[in-house]
């Protein structure tokens, strides 16, 4: 059987994966610092969450292309608490962030189009982009008493095939969150080059220290075609 070349990834065990496996096989403790799977973190879920699933109304199948209206309204209510006013018709629910990325790649890009992503960044992007025939170009974050974007470096990375700038706010794995001045510069670049600004805000509620300073990027980047999405409006498991 012949498979597509787009999935011809190197599947050899990495040095980190090998060290993890050997430690697990030896029964030694493992501190999984980037763990983000809530089903493995020992959380005690509110019984009301499970009780809601026993409601006979949950058996009523009423598919809505953008997702259940009440759920989309709940997303709007959440963003209102972050000073962002949205309407349910501006919200589309997906089964995962991976599906959301795939939808966006297909919406914004043709085969061979490019999207700029921060580096260091989330390695899953590389695999998702290949599946949708999109090329990722790395825009390096700069470290100077904390991580930050380099607007001029990003400008030099833009080509005629670039369709969007993609961010994680706060970033994974650096923890860097976009400051107001960075958002203004990124918005200016997007306007100048007719680019979309894609922002993954899955970690928006997990700022360290003065968490009140962590706002949705939409409050800063005005006048830009932007897409934001999150992955925490769900019950895992």
Predicted segment positions?
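Short catalytic/ligand-binding loop motif for oxyanion handling, primarily in non-cytosolic enzymes
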Residues: 26, 39-43, 174-175, 193, ...
